[in-house]
Amino acid sequence: ADSRKPI
């Protein structure tokens, strides 16, 4: 899973 989150 991607741990990147939109700002």
Curated annotation (Swiss-Prot):
It is found in: Secreted. Contains 2 disulfide bonds. GO terms for molecular function: lyase activity; metal ion binding; toxin activity. Binds 1 Mg(2+) ion per subunit. Its main location: secreted. Keywords: Cytolysis, Dermonecrotic toxin, Disulfide bond, Hemolysis, Lipid degradation, Lipid metabolism, Lyase, Magnesium, Metal-binding, Secreted, Toxin. GO terms for cellular component: extracellular region. It comes from the Eukaryota. One of its GO terms (biological process) is lipid catabolic process. Its cofactor is Mg(2+). Its EC number is 4.6.1.-. Expressed by the venom gland. It catalyses: an N-(acyl)-sphingosylphosphocholine = an N-(acyl)-sphingosyl-1,3-cyclic phosphate + choline; an N-(acyl)-sphingosylphosphoethanolamine = an N-(acyl)-sphingosyl-1,3-cyclic phosphate + ethanolamine; a 1-acyl-sn-glycero-3-phosphocholine = a 1-acyl-sn-glycero-2,3-cyclic phosphate + choline; a 1-acyl-sn-glycero-3-phosphoethanolamine = a 1-acyl-sn-glycero-2,3-cyclic phosphate + ethanolamine. It is an enzyme of class 4 (lyase). Belongs to the arthropod phospholipase D family. Dermonecrotic toxins cleave the phosphodiester linkage between the phosphate and headgroup of certain phospholipids (sphingolipid and lysolipid substrates), forming an alcohol (often choline) and a cyclic phosphate. This toxin acts on sphingomyelin (SM). It may also act on ceramide phosphoethanolamine (CPE), lysophosphatidylcholine (LPC) and lysophosphatidylethanolamine (LPE), but not on lysophosphatidylserine (LPS), and lysophosphatidylglycerol (LPG). It acts by transphosphatidylation, releasing exclusively cyclic phosphate products as second products. This is Dermonecrotic toxin LgSicTox-beta-LOXN3.
